[in-house]
Amino acid sequence: MQLYLRSILLVFICALAVSTARAASAVPFAQSVPATPGFCDAQSDPSWFKQHAKPRYARGFEVSYGHRTKKVVVRQPWKGAAQEFVYTLICPGVALEAVAGQRSVQIPTRRMAALSTTYMGQIALLRAEARLAGVKNPELVQTESVKERLADGRILGLGSGAAVDVERLVRLEPDLVMTFAMGDPTSDLHPAIERLRLPVVLNGEYLETTPLGRAEWIMFLAYFLDQEREAAEIFSTVEREYLRLSGLARAVRGPRPTVMGGSPYGDTWWVPGGDGYIGTLFRDAGGEYIFADKHETVSVALQFEAVLRRGAPAQVWIMDNADPQQLAQQEPRIRHFASVQTGEIYSARARADYCESGLANPQVLLADTIRVLHPQLLPTHELQFLRRSPITP
């Protein structure tokens, strides 16, 4: 059940779709920055890292710095986890005996295996594609610089679906395997990877409940790549633009446009929880989310009658990668929704790399949502991740 719930959540948050060329946008995507000395560099000032490399929005990890070591704590590796995962990162020259018995990782990472495509946008921003040796589910990758390396063999595919190609992973000889867990012993990969004596790290970014919190996991990745300065500068531009945009939406006077989210999956209608990522995005964009009172951080299952009763008056419907036209054929009653009758339906279907550069650039996701809910605020912004998808008669 946990696996199913997470897959439903990711369907909405990370609508994996076909990448298209980006249209001109009034809101910029984050850009890479020049390389700077890392913590392990002898010329670096350790005090900078202790002051500026700690998360401020992300709740799932923390870091502390020692003498040529970093201690990284993943506070919640999966929803409801009763344990933290602590990793000791060691710079060159530190004796392994000093960290015996600990989950230790030698840094900077040179050969990384990524078992989720959601890290690709941040890897590209850090210009770390050359350090990526393998990726699971390569057919889902949308980041162009990674796709090019997959195509010419510089990055290897590590299997598709829930399984990982263990033999290929071992042959890869990675110095870091980054993956996620759900607390399900039948599907979690990290125990088996640990038994192979490969350094494996759990990334809990998917549990963050705010767009800025999730984007700040670029810092987590940077700890292993020893690129905290670059990550901090990149995230600073993301944060500044996100806060500027949310301030614009917050300043709008009068009633907020009502918005509903989610779509049916089988016989059940799944809507984003009011306290989760999408609920926060709707709120920051100046919308009144009709299911804000569903105080969950993951998607919530509802009967269609409940959705029909509360969702029908909503002015805007922003869904995942579902096909609105197909939904109308399967469930004709949605044609009674106000959003359907006015054509104010937006989806992420066949639009862009929502799950990669979208999560790394929440300021653009926010701009898209503001453009939909308050078009007068961003008249020159062209939608990057959403598209208007009216249902025809």
Where are these regions (language model features)?
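Positively charged n-region of N-terminal signal peptides that target proteins for export
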Residues: 1-6
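N-terminal ligand-binding lobe of clamshell/alpha-beta domains
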Residues: 23-393
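Cleavable N-terminal signal peptides
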Residues: 10, 21-24
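Bacterial N-terminal signal peptides
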Residues: 7-17
